[in-house]
């Protein structure tokens, strides 16, 4: 009986040691993969503690001083998309704010920049008078640019752009299904002075009227037939270029190929794709005026950069990637569930061995 107890004790001890060694080997392997992952690129990051902190870090990178800024509601990616070409034209930052409160980090950044005037994009239900009152407390003037809906707001912004420089090209983005495509297109469109008209099926006639009234020569339709049917091309008298892919990732790459000289392309910004977290779009739009100035495109990624995206970067000679709003993770060989499971097994084994020892002492070896 004594030999049997010793044998069982050794088995349990060996099992615990093997479990710990196995878990340790997984961690070592994961650490190695993390170090090697994307090692062919120089990696930089602009990541704050929250969305507002990330905005201020983008602002700090792009603007030492700016007498003007643009405010967009955190609930209106649509207005954010149409605002980027104006922000680029005026060389001013964009901040996304709550409808009734300016985050303290944004307030501090406004003071650092020396902002004297803010353009509020959208109606009062998006950015209320409480925002106006806070601006007054900061001795900052404001001007509201808005229409009765997102389409009309985008038209107002386009007209503002036209006041400073006559527009000959426009882009159409579907405000319902085309937001992901619109976000990553903004830097390239803005750099070329192309305003973005946000529209849906109900506003297409008004969009066509705007194109005709301004003698637009060329129209970029961003997105596939789900966003815009082929019939829209027949209604537009200008030259039409449709940029589309099978999904947001492929459309993203098509946009870059359309507007960028890929032979000279060596840097890129990477943001998360917005599938899980809406704030990812806000990161991209805050970044967009700066990316437009630098002529650096934005690429979508999930938590890990996909094989197709990595190949796209390598094929186009990208050597520097800047991760904005998040840090790209390497492929996981150890998931959180695996860690929890392995830890639970180790704890059970340790408790079992400890319990056996206690029972043995308690019953003087009879167990």
Show which residues each predicted segment covers.
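N-terminal Lys/Arg-rich, disordered targeting/topogenic segments
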Residues: 1-8, 367
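Extracellular glycan-binding segments that recognize GlcNAc-based cell-wall polysaccharides
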Residues: 7-16, 25-364
């Amino acid at each position: 009986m004594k030999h049997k107890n010793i044998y069982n004790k050794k088995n349990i001890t060996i099992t615990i040691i093997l479990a710990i060694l196995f878990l340790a080997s997984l961690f070592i392997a994961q650490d190695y993969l993390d170090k090697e992952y994307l090692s062919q690129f120089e990696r930089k990051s602009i990541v704050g503690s929250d969305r507002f902190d990330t905005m201020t870090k983008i602002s700090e990178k792009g603007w030492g001083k700016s007498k003007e800024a643009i405010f967009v509601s955190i609930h209106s990616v649509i207005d954010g998309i149409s605002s980027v070409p104006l922000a680029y034209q005026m060389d001013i930052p964009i901040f996304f704010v709550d409808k009734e409160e300016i985050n303290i980090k944004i307030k501090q950044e406004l003071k650092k920049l020396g902002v004297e005037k803010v353009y509020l994009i959208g109606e009062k239900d998006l950015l209320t008078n409480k925002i106006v009152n806070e601006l007054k407390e900061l001795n900052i003037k404001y001007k509201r640019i808005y229409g009765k809906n997102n389409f009309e707001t985008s038209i107002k912004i386009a007209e503002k752009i036209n006041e400073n420089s006559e527009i000959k090209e426009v882009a159409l983005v579907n405000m319902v299904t085309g937001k992901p495509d619109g976000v990553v297109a903004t830097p390239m469109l803005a750099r070329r002075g192309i305003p973005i008209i946000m529209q849906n099926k109900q506003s297409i006639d008004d969009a066509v009227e705007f194109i005709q009234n301004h003698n637009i020569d060329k129209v970029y339709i961003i997105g596939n037939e789900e966003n815009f049917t082929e019939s829209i091309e027949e209604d537009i008298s200008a030259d039409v270029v449709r940029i589309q892919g099978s999904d947001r990732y492929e459309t993203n790459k098509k946009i870059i190929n359309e507007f960028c000289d890929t032979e000279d392309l060596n840097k890129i910004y990477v943001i998360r794709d917005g599938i899980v977290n809406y704030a990812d779009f806000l990161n991209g739009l805050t970044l967009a005026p700066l990316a437009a100035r630098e002529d650096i495109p934005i690429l979508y990624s999930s938590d890990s950069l996909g094989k197709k995206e990595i190949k796209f970067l390598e094929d186009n000679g990208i050597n520097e990637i800047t991760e904005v709003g998040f840090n790209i993770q390497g492929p996981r060989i150890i998931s959180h569930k695996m860690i929890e499971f392995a830890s639970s097994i180790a704890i059970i084994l340790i408790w079992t061995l400890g319990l056996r020892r206690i029972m043995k002492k308690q019953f003087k070896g009879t167990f």
